Amino acid sequence: MAGHSQFKNIMHRKGAQDAKRAKQFAKVLREITVATRSGLPDPTSNPRLRAAISMAREVNMPKDNVERAIKKASGAAGGDDYVEVRYEGYGPAGVAIIVEGLTDNRNRTAGEVRAAFSKHGGSLGETNSVSFMFQRLGVISYPLDVASEDEMLEAAIEAGADNAETTEEGHEVTCAMENFFAVRDALESRFGEPQSAKLDWRPENSVTLDEDKARSVMKLIDVLEDSDDIQAVYANFDIPDDVAEALAA
């Protein structure tokens, strides 16, 4: 029986991983669809599509899937018609939260997001109710072995970035939103394709959470991220190491 239980646990974890992978693929495919329809289906002349293809590589999406999505979005039918949406509000402990999505039904998505906030100790606010607490930045990441700290900083500044930080995890270049595509392309021409390149909301200040509040906030974020319509969730909280260890136990 123990072996059977262990097998069930392994299969449950594998099933959860497969479900997560499928959800990641679905979100990236939506971005590819919107990116393709926002410009030309050629990534060399469509910066947003190029970024979407980079996202697909990050989640190890097969190249065939990407090509089919581009072909479908650029065809006469055009695929599903998605619009970009953004929601802002507060979670437990006054944590500010920004939710970005791509949806084919604004009313459905707004209802789901509002219900998630209400059910999990938060409140959905108006547009721009919390975004002033964040900076909208381009973030480009590279592994350590592509350049030294000084080389990356010099290249980043020359490309028009605001800063480059190097840690044991790699190089991270940040730039103004309007310079994102130019900076990314300049760095790519010098160091090759980045590990990741995306627009991000970075909080000006963070709320430090205890274990109970951290569980509540993470539950809300998990529910939001589980929606097919939601592409990304950003929040201004910080979880101390000891609390993170307790949550992982």
UniProtKB/Swiss-Prot annotation:
The keyword tRNA processing does not apply. SUPFAM superfamilies: YebC-like (SSF75625). The keyword DNA-binding applies. GO terms for biological process: regulation of DNA-templated transcription. PANTHER family: TRANSCRIPTIONAL REGULATORY PROTEIN YEBC-RELATED, TRANSLATIONAL ACTIVATOR OF CYTOCHROME C OXIDASE 1. Belongs to the TACO1 family. This is Probable transcriptional regulatory protein GOX1679.
